[in-house]
């Protein structure tokens, strides 16, 4: 996978502008920041923005009355959140191929994303690519409903946590010169 570079910003922003209906909130400074953090992939005219959670993070939210809108979904530290995937409309490349490659290279067992409930094209795309609906969310103070999807990456093996070894003082003993002296009690 090719992480985007600063020189790619114009191309990336043009792809987002062509898809303004679904990404009206994406700003250039936001993409520049993500590029600096190696959180933007540009491959075959497909853009993916993502990051790894540094702490446990609730993904499901409440409706405008403050009620839970379904099962609570909690991402754990180290899980991946895919923020956006968008393709150049003029390109013949397949976003599905790029997404599958992303799934194979991401360093996480779980990849989450949320999408507006009305975005049927995206929802069908996510389902075709092995994601499962796991919860609901909202934006704009509960006015814009969304779905939470999860891809479980069984190819990634999480490294074991660092093992902390406690230092112990070793008691020095007298050296024994002969076998007979060693065997005496």
Residue ranges and their predicted role:
Residues 1-7, 160-163, 185:
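Conserved N-terminal entry element of GNAT/NAT acetyltransferase domains
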Residues 1-26:
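Short amphipathic alpha-helix that is part of the acyltransferase structural core
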Residues 16, 126, 131:
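Conserved active-site tyrosine of GNAT-family acetyltransferases
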Residues 20-40, 49-51:
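Active-site rim helix/loop that mediates acceptor-substrate recognition in acyltransferases
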Residues 37-42, 47, 84, 112, ...:
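Short hydrophobic/aromatic beta-strand element in the GNAT-like acyltransferase core
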Residues 49-84, 90, 140-145:
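Conserved acyl-donor/pantetheine-binding loop and adjacent beta-alpha core of acyl/acetyltransferases
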Residues 91-105, 124, 128:
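Conserved acetyl-CoA-binding loop-helix of GNAT-fold acetyltransferases
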Residues 113-123, 139-144:
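Conserved beta-strand-loop-alpha-helix junction that forms the acyl-donor binding cleft
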